[in-house]
Amino acid sequence: MTDNLQSFESISQVGKTETKKPSDPLQAEYEEGKKYLANEEYGQAAVALHNALVGFKEKNDEVGIANASNQLGHVCLARKEYENALQHYLQALAICEKSNDRMSILAVMKKIVTVRTHLKKYDEALADCLTILDHYQDNRDPQGTVTILEEMAEVYIKAGKKEKAADAYRTIASIHKNFRHDNIAAKFLEKAVQLTSES
């Protein structure tokens, strides 16, 4: 018999967890900002996250700076303050690249693509898409490849480059065909045909 039994105090209902407040006031401010953001209270989220960002900068806490900048980017994106969103995302991206955090780099870059598309900086958005695409292809990630190719097609359409968007859709169809997803492949080929007939 073992003595390594879980104490009764630590057992709770499934899905029910106690939310403990972080002991660090900066982290508490950051978490509060995230809650405001989740509740679409963007003004309060911006204040809390900005305060956390200032505090993280004073402590030279790069992880905190990256996280707060990323969340502030989300707030600005939701408020359609695209230039501010871009600045926050670029700050987060620089820190993620410095620490070589590949997953965070991809997540932030996808947001940067969205922001640059809203700003009609299509060439920059497409360059970022190609960087993301390289990562997915290097890691042999067909799902990620398809997702970013769809994003590229949308950017091409907004940029008025329908033929390139059609090429992206044909590439997506080819990937799906390789995995015997014939119905999905047919839908993307149809999108490509529609775009080329509109050109």
Give the role of each language-model region:
Residues 1-199:
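Intrinsically disordered, low-complexity regions
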